[in-house]
């Protein structure tokens, strides 16, 4: 017969209590997300190192609210705007949910998520703005004024892609969306990623705000070329520059997000207006989101004025124009 002494029982009880205390303190690695009065309770820090229902990762809607979206794009539904009633907060959040598990707005903690929102939406605003110097509310308040190119000069059909992304008869691949995409090969690639027939129906992007935001986030998250980083990986610090990148003055900075998206249209040409306009939107959005532009870094990290372009244009650009 096995005899258990009272001292052993006390030790076992203490061990059990200690284990429960560890679980309560968050040292159990399988704690589920709890909610108290509708708010998430996380005992392991802001986020876990993987995406799981057992982790405490916040989503974009946890820190980016509808009132902030309205502040950033306050003039988008004024009568003179060209996409009145098209863009809205819920369409953005629905689109973003597809990419949150891939790190969009959920990489590196809450502050990094907020900064990425300001950066991404700063790009969006600068590319869809109808603001000008004396516009009501200032030139930075007019983002999401457009959802399409108003007077396209061509159909943007590149026949060199006819075997992989052939142009559909009658289709026109002019700029559409929140980060406007151009050319048949871009519509084809985006359509494959988003499971939408954009090659045959590029007009879907100007008809559906969620799809338009998804196409923009896809462009932000996806390298234009396999050997290159995405704008997302540059901004959040996932990308490690090579020696050639360093010599070309490219680094994990906001400036390099402009470079990888727009190349020589914006970068490597000194302090030009297209570049400064994007920077101004980013800083303005940081201020409106309550972060402050001092967190944006020095000017040489914001600028791409002296960077060599990632993709010099010898053929139609595969990036947004």
Swiss-Prot record:
Signal peptide: 1-26
Function: No chitinase activity. Essential for normal plant growth and development. Regulates cell expansion extent and differentiation at least in roots and hypocotyls. Prevents lignin accumulation in the pith. May modulate ethylene-mediated regulation during development. Probably required to establish thermotolerance acclimation. Plays a role for controlled anisotropic cell expansion in the regulation of waving during root gravitropism and thigmotropism. Involved in the root system architecture adaptation to multiple environmental conditions such as nitrate.
Record region (Disordered): 297-321
Protein name: Chitinase-like protein 1
Pfam families for the chain: Glyco_hydro_19 (PF00182)
Outcome when changing residue 188 to R: In hot2-1; reduced tolerance to abiotic stresses such as salt, drought and heat
Domain of life: Eukaryota
Expression induction or repression: Repressed after wounding or treatment with ethylene.
Organism name: Arabidopsis thaliana (Mouse-ear cress)
GO cellular component terms listed in the entry, alphabetical order: apoplast; Golgi apparatus
Database matches in Gene3D superfamilies: 1.10.530.10, Endochitinase, domain 2
The keyword Flavoprotein appears for this protein: no
GO MF annotation terms: polysaccharide binding
Example GO BP: cell fate specification
Family per similarity comment: Belongs to the glycosyl hydrolase 19 family.
Record keywords, A-Z: Developmental protein, Disulfide bond, Ethylene signaling pathway, Glycoprotein, Secreted, Signal
Effect of disrupting the coding gene: Abnormal root expansion with ectopic root-hairs, reduced growth, excess lateral stems and smaller leaves. Loss of regulation of the extent of root epidermal and cortex cell expansion. Ectopic deposition of lignin and aberrant shapes of cells with incomplete cell walls in the pith of inflorescence stems. Exaggerated hook curvature, reduced length and increased diameter of hypocotyls in dark-grown seedlings, and reduced root length and increased number of root hairs in light-grown seedlings. Increased ethylene production. Exhibit also thermotolerance defect.
């Amino acid at each position: 017969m096995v005899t258990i002494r009272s001292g052993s029982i006390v030790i076992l009880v203490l061990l059990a209590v200690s284990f429960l205390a560890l679980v309560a303190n968050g040292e159990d690695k399988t704690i589920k997300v709890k909610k108290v009065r509708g708010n998430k309770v996380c005992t392991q820090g802001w986020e876990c190192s993987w995406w799981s229902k057992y982790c405490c990762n916040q989503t974009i809607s946890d820190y980016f609210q509808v009132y902030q979206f309205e502040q950033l794009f306050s003039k988008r539904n004024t009568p003179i705007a060209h996409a009145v009633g098209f863009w809205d907060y819920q369409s953005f959040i629905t689109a973003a949910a597809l990419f949150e598990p891939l790190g969009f707005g959920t990489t590196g903690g809450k502050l990094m998520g907020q900064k990425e929102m300001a950066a991404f939406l700063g790009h969006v605003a600068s590319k869809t703005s109808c603001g000008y110097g004396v516009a009501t509310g200032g030139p930075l308040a007019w983002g999401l004024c457009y959802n399409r190119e108003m007077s396209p000069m061509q159909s943007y059909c590149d026949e060199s892609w006819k075997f992989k992304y052939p142009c559909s008869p009658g289709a026109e691949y002019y700029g559409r969306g929140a980060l406007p995409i151009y050319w048949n090969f871009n519509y084809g690639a985006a359509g494959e990623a988003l499971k939408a027939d954009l090659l045959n129906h590029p007009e879907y992007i100007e008809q559906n705000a969620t799809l338009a935001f998804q196409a923009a986030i896809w462009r932000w998250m996806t390298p234009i070329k396999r050997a290159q980083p995405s704008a997302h990986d540059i901004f959040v610090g996932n990308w490690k520059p090579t020696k050639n990148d360093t010599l070309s003055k490219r680094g994990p900075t906001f400036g390099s997000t402009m470079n990888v998206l727009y190349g020589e249209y914006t970068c490597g040409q000194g302090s030009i207006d297209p570049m400064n306009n994007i920077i101004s939107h980013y800083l303005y959005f940081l201020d409106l989101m309550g972060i402050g532009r001092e967190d944006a870094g020095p000017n040489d990290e914001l600028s791409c004025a002296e960077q060599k372009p990632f993709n010099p244009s010898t053929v139609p650009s595969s990036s947004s124009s």
